[in-house]
Amino acid sequence: MTVGDLYRDLLSELLPQRQAHSCEVGRKAESVAGLVSPSLRGDLVVAATLHDIGYAHKQTGFHALDGARFLASMGFGTNVCNLVVQHSASQIEAEVRGINVNVFKEFEVGVDLDAAHSVIAWADMTTSPTGGTVMVEERLDEIQSRYGPEALVTAFIDRARPRLLAAGQSPMGSMRV
């Protein structure tokens, strides 16, 4: 049984393509979970699988924040919520959206999650919307094409591209570029 199977009810709230993407991101994270501390492996895989759940629970329109808040309301731990709220350079997206980055403080943790953040970014940036494996450059171009040149998401990708490219190169790619 996969984590995707365990969270099928939650994932069913997403569009079918996003379900496939989310399950594959979780599967990829699980395949390299040995790169993070044993105590974080479960949280890593859960967060990777549920990283886009905020698209189904819109409050602010910023899916990373909406997802973390939803998961917190469902009783998920702070590590999972932190990994969701900060996945794939989301602090840059918050800035582009005009959201004060202090919102991330509600999910602060007292442990080092850098390796787990890197794994999720790598898995997310190398997984297509339908769950296939892609090069990170293809993924970024696809996102911008899907949203269009005037979209906030396109502006976010433009600003975050160096970080996302680095993250997509390996499961331990740097989100600190």
Per-segment meaning from a language model:
Residues V25, R41-L71, C81-Q91:
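His-Asp-centered metal-binding catalytic motifs of divalent-metal-dependent phosphohydrolases/nucleases
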Residues L10-P38, L50, F76, E95-V96, ...:
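Divalent metal-dependent phosphate-bond-processing catalytic cores, especially two-metal-ion Mg2+/Mn2+ enzymes
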